[in-house]
Amino acid sequence: MADMSLTIITPERTVLRDAPADAVVVPVVDGSMGILKNHAPMVANLRIGVLRYKQDGVYKRVAVTGGFVEVSENRITVLADAAELAESIDVMRAMEAKRRAEARLRDRKANIDRTRAEAALRRAMVRLRAAGALDHDKD
């Protein structure tokens, strides 16, 4: 039986609502933070990364792109700019987005917005990590 519940909401939709969770690891601006039962109440800024939550002994992944996490009374609420469950990620589309961003960053002659291209690359990499399509599991 899970000790906590996890809700993930974006401006467009609710990704998870009261999902049972035994543990949650969220990507925060200064690293990753683990949340277990009876965690102290808190609010933190999220960074682009992979949120992991343990359910029935298995960690599940969600790609998140910024926002906030709130912990209160064994309820974890994530308000994310965008979020995508690992099983919903179109890996081919994410790989293509990664390839396009890398190509834009390599092209020194092109007049591109490097900040946007770097952000696009980070988002694509996070989606691929969440989907398990990369060799490593770092946030």
From Swiss-Prot:
It comes from the Bacteria. CDD domains: F1-ATPase_delta. Coiled coil: none annotated. Its main location: membrane. The keyword Acetylation does not apply. It is found in: Cell membrane. It is a peripheral membrane protein. Keywords: ATP synthesis, Cell membrane, CF(1), Hydrogen ion transport, Ion transport, Membrane, Transport. Gene3D superfamilies: ATP synthase delta/epsilon subunit, C-terminal domain, F0F1 ATP synthase delta/epsilon subunit, N-terminal. Produces ATP from ADP in the presence of a proton gradient across the membrane. Belongs to the ATPase epsilon chain family. F-type ATPases have 2 components, CF(1) - the catalytic core - and CF(0) - the membrane proton channel. CF(1) has five subunits: alpha(3), beta(3), gamma(1), delta(1), epsilon(1). CF(0) has three main subunits: a, b and c. This is ATP synthase epsilon chain. It comes from Symbiobacterium thermophilum (strain DSM 24528 / JCM 14929 / IAM 14863 / T). The lineage of its organism: Bacteria, Bacillati, Bacillota, Clostridia, Eubacteriales.
